[in-house]
Amino acid sequence: MNRSELNDIIKNIVEDNGCDLYDIELSEEGGHKYFRVYITKPGGVSLNDCAKINNLISPIFDIEDPVEGKYFLEVSSPGLERKLTKPEHFEKSIGEKVKVTTNDGTKLKGELKSFIDNVAEIGKEKVNFDDIKKAKTYIEWNTYKYEE
């Protein structure tokens, strides 16, 4: 099974369980491989959603390993501060605060005002999606105040 077929199977499992597939990531940390499946849904993802989808994907991976060697499967929400790696991530993040690094090293930070024809408008700047090296949403934690 190739990566595209595997992604389609995972996407179908996620969508059949009322969630959307946000991203799939293979990483190595501390000498361990991780196959991460990030899911979203309106109102937020619950621990039960993650466990259910993990339990449906796991038997498939027992038959068809997604990577060579030992790995850990994780299913989770992408979180409040999440990577933006696809055009649809930008489209769904309009109105949120983002940090972007372009291919030439320029750093932009501000509200994602629009994403039209693969061009992100961040504050007063515009940047083409193909010129983005990395991007993520962020939260300004000091703007939240606890009131008794």
Curated annotation (Swiss-Prot):
Cystine bridges: none
Cytoplasm among keywords: yes
Main location: cytoplasm
SUPFAM superfamilies according to UniProt: YhbC-like, C-terminal domain (SSF74942), YhbC-like, N-terminal domain (SSF75420)
UniProt cross-references to InterPro entries, sorted A to Z: Ribosome_maturation_RimP, RimP_C, RimP_C_sf, RimP_N, RimP_N_sf
Locations listed in the record: Cytoplasm
Pfam families: DUF150_C (PF17384), RimP_N (PF02576)
Keywords assigned: Cytoplasm, Ribosome biogenesis
Keyword Cytoplasm in record: yes
GO annotation terms (biological process): ribosomal small subunit assembly; translation
Any single Gene Ontology cellular-component annotation: cytosol
Domain of life: Bacteria
Similarity remark: Belongs to the RimP family.
Free-text function comment from the UniProt entry: Required for maturation of 30S ribosomal subunits.
Name of the featured protein: Ribosome maturation factor RimP
UniProt source species: Nautilia profundicola (strain ATCC BAA-1463 / DSM 18972 / AmH)
